[in-house]
């Protein structure tokens, strides 16, 4: 029963509803601390902590944000951190330097390990009850981090939300909107951010003449400031940079798809080591995979394929595809009040199972 009430606390404080708003009148808000961790390279990096009412020897949850300039300040991640702290879990939101720069790099795996080691050494947490969740691109990167021998005392629960199985397939979806779960083909309107992530990361592999720093500055402004400085930046660029930006942001032509494919061929050896499809056989721990059915950044089919591949190898995996969520946002729910209640119940049961070690 204790697990049930804690699960209910999390769900009611994550999904907007009148009951959750009413409960805030009777609950003391978690204390929020700005702390830090040190990377292998010696850099001190900010880490936000949500503290529950109980101060000593409590379970812990590390939430690794995805690739976003908001990093540890991301609104949806902070909403989840607040909810889990209200349920009695000390919750950590680390900044991963490259991911804040909208870069998907091998170095981020090292920094995720640095975070885990920092949390594990704390005196105010139960070291046997640490759960970790990686969001978006950070999900599969953290799964790989768990293969490192420094995490031999693995998290009590390893969670990946809205992430990819095959990095190359996920990036191709960002351009074409086409995806497959291995049995059925789907076509969606891909989120613009996916295109920006692709080109921002791999500009130097394009054959087009351009100034990468100019184009990256423009793309980063699109995601960090909603393009607030875009017109000013664009006006100052030479013509070849403008032409490339136009292709990246809005061109859906066959030429762009071919341009992307040329880049893919060059970077395959970079993408493969970051893809679970490459290290499936090394995964020897239970995995919890969640995905939004309406996700247009990384399609839910990536999680379906990941689950199927693990099951075929006899590995333990638990999966939940939510019709309530897209990538990090809650979509309008069109199945009526009863449908919403049933979906929340399904979600709650999965969260209760997934976070059982720390609730």
List the model feature ranges, each with a label.
Residues 52-85, 93-96:
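Short, surface-exposed "cap/lid" segments of acyl-processing enzymes
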Residues 283, 289-291, 295:
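Short beta-strand/loop motif that positions the catalytic acidic residue
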Residues 134-142, 158:
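Gly/Ala-rich beta-loop-alpha elbow adjacent to hydrolase catalytic centers
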Residues 77, 285, 299-309:
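Short alpha-helix in the alpha/beta-hydrolase fold that links the catalytic acid
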Residues 5-59:
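N-terminal cap/lid segment of alpha/beta-hydrolase-fold proteins
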Residues 144-239:
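Alpha/beta-hydrolase-fold enzymes
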Residues 103-127, 131:
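Alpha/beta-hydrolase active-site loop
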Residues 172, 233-273, 277, 304-308, ...:
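C-terminal catalytic histidine-bearing segment of alpha/beta-hydrolase fold enzymes
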């Amino acid at each position: 029963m204790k697990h049930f009430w804690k699960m209910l606390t999390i769900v009611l404080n994550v999904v907007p509803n009148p009951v959750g708003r009413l409960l805030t009148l009777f609950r003391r808000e978690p204390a929020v601390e700005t702390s830090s961790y040190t990377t292998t390279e010696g850099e001190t990096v900010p880490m936000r902590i949500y503290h529950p009412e109980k101060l000593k020897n409590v379970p812990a949850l590390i939430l690794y944000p995805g690739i976003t300039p908001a990093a540890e300040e991301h609104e949806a991640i902070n909403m989840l951190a607040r909810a889990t702290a209200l349920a009695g879990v000390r919750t950590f939101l680390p900044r991963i330097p490259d991911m804040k720069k909208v870069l998907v790099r091998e170095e981020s795996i090292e920094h995720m390990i640095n975070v885990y080691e920092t949390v594990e050494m704390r005196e105010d947490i139960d070291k046997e009850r640490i759960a970790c969740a990686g969001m978006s691109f950070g999900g599969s990167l953290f799964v790989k981090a768990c293969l490192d021998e420094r995490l031999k005392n693995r998290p009590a629960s390893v969670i990946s939300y809205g992430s990819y199985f095959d990095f190359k397939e996920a990036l191709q979806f960002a351009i074409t909107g086409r995806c497959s779960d291995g049995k059925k083909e789907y076509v969606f309107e891909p989120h613009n951010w996916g295109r920006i992530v692709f080109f921002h990361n791999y500009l130097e592999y394009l054959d087009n003449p351009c100034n990468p720093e100019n184009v990256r500055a423009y793309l980063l402004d699109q995601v960090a400031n909603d393009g607030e400085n875009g017109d000013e930046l664009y006006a100052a660029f030479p013509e070849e940079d403008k032409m490339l930006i136009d292709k990246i942001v809005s061109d859906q032509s066959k030429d762009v798809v071919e341009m992307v494919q040329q880049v893919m061929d060059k970077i395959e050896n970079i993408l493969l080591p970051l893809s679970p499809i490459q290290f499936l056989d090394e995964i020897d721990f239970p995995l919890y995979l969640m995905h939004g059915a309406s996700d247009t950044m990384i399609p839910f089919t990536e999680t379906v394929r990941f689950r199927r591949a693990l099951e075929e190898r006899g590995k333990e995996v638990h999966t939940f595809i939510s019709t309530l969520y897209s990538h990090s946002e809650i979509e309008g729910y069109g199945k009526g009040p009863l449908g919403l209640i049933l979906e929340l119940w399904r979600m709650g049961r999965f969260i209760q199972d997934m976070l059982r070690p720390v609730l």
